[in-house]
């Protein structure tokens, strides 16, 4: 059985169900599998099979304390008519690559792929573990996770969900998605700060034993819907496996041939899922980690030194406006195999704002390439791929495509590439419209309508008429007031 252990070595190994409920380990580390399971099938044997079949097999391999029937029920509940694409994840050839379109769920972002199933995994885990407390989901968001988590957990019995977002660091559409969220158990707060402030605040709450005791006295237990929760990460592995199978199915590659994987990266969870897919047996030649002007990961990959002592930029790809990439800790654990080393690096980051990794970890990063695109390059990429292929992409996907093109020019590597397309262009309609040379509109919602008229690409139903919905969550709080907000939400 796969057990879940902390990246920092503390606590006892846990079942998947226990790790999903707990969210973060007792020693502040993140849960990782003690071994990564092998692919439970040969990719060529799965061609033509629906996404649900792939997801069931991959999630079941990691979460083997769930019964086959439990995993099937979770998958069936998650990947249904909530997704507007019949095949859940279309794989589209454009711009010299293959785009994994991960944004056809209810909130038009890749977070739906995991956050549609996490509530089912969580409620199943609660039953399996005989958990008597109400589960309070705490989530920090740079824009997309918050809405996807709210949509997933809204009115789920036995749960409350509390979301914190940077009040001035998300797009107009993203903000309206969260502030209009329905559900008696949903609580949304803008904070006066950036995503790192929100994420750090949430982590501090998890680490505060006295505060957790107060929450327990209210009959509740804290958990997370961020990618620090292993229940968020594992479902993401499935779509990289599915993308590989699709390329085999179409004759782009033969089973066993390598691919490159390109991911616009903020908190490092999405690209880490592709690393897990490769450890299972999907042949990956290069992982290409694409950043915006907040290029902390690009610099780390190129130098081995991670430093947060740098200017923070608000960009047109806000979901990557991050300086502290939480999931990188998991990769450091897998590459070092040494929880004491990981613990020491995380301590250095907390105290000094930087760390430098060992030669062993550097050597383990040989298949990881880093690059970045600034805001103008991002807009140019949107215009270029639309001109070339009539293909509409959002700002984050544009960063990935630009960085991939730079990599290909630099290396001459023509290995077929899967690019994670992480959000609908309509979530960032103003910037996309600007890239396409369209006239200015009065607000983000007018840009949505104008962009649909120009391109003929339908607006996702979850974004249509968003500006006409009632605002239900208008609170903006100081970054020091997160604990009070949580307590007010659970009473």
Predicted regions and their residues:
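PLP-dependent amino-acid enzyme catalytic core
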Residues: 1-491
């Amino acid at each position: 059985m796969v057990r879940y252990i902390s990246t920092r070595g503390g606590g006892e190994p846990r079942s998947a169900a226990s790790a999903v409920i707990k969210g973060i380990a007792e020693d502040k580390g993140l849960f990782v599998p003690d071994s990564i399971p092998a692919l439970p099938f040969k990719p060529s044997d799965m061609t033509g099979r629906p996404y649900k079949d792939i997801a069931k097999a991959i999630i079941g391999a990691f979460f083997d304390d769930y019964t086959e029937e439990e995993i099937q029920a979770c998958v069936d509940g998650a990947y249904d008519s909530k997704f507007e694409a019949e095949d859940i994840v279309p794989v589209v050839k454009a711009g010299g690559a293959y785009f994994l379109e991960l944004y056809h769920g209810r909130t038009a972002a890749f977070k739906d792929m995991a956050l549609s199933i996490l509530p089912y995994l969580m409620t199943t885990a609660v039953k399996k573990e005989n958990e008597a407390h109400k589960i309070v989901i705490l989530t920090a968001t740079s824009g997309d996770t918050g809405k996807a988590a709210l949509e997933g957990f809204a009115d789920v019995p036995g749960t409350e969900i509390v979301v914190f977002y940077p009040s001035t660091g998300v797009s107009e559409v993203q903000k309206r998605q969260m502030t209009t969220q329905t559900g008696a158990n949903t609580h949304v707060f803008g904070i006066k700060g950036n995503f790192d402030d929100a994420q750090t605040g949430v982590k501090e709450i998890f680490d505060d034993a006295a505060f957790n005791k107060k929450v327990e006295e209210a009959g509740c237990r804290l958990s997370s819907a961020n990618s620090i929760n292993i229940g968020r990460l594992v479902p993401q592995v499935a779509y990289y496996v599915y993308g590989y199978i699709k390329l085999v199915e179409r004759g782009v590659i033969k089973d066993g041939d390598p691919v490159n994987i390109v991911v616009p990266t903020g908190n490092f969870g999405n690209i880490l899922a592709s690393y897990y897919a490769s450890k299972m047996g999907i042949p990956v030649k290069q992982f290409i980690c694409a950043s915006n002007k907040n290029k902390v990961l690009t610099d780390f990959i190129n130098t081995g030194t991670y430093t947060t002592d740098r200017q923070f930029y608000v960009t047109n790809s806000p979901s990557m406006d991050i300086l502290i990439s939480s999931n990188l800790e998991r990769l450091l654990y897998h590459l070092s195999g040494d929880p004491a080393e990981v613990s020491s690096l995380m301590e250095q980051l907390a105290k000094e704002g930087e760390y430098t990794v060992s030669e062993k970890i550097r050597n383990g990063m040989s298949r990881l390439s880093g690059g970045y695109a600034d805001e103008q390059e991002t807009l140019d990429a949107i215009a270029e791929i639309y001109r070339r292929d009539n293909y509409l992409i959002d700002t984050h996907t544009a960063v990935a495509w630009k960085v991939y093109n730079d990599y290909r020019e630099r290396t001459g590597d023509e290995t077929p590439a899967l690019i994670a397309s992480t959000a609908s262009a309509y979530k960032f309609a103003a910037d996309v419209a600007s890239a396409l040379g369209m006239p200015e509109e009065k607000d983000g919602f007018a840009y949505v309508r104008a962009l649909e008229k120009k391109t003929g690409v339908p607006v996702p139903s979850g974004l249509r008429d968003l500006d006409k919905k009632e605002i239900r969550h208008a609170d903006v709080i100081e970054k020091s007031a997160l604990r009070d907000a949580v307590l007010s939400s659970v009473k």
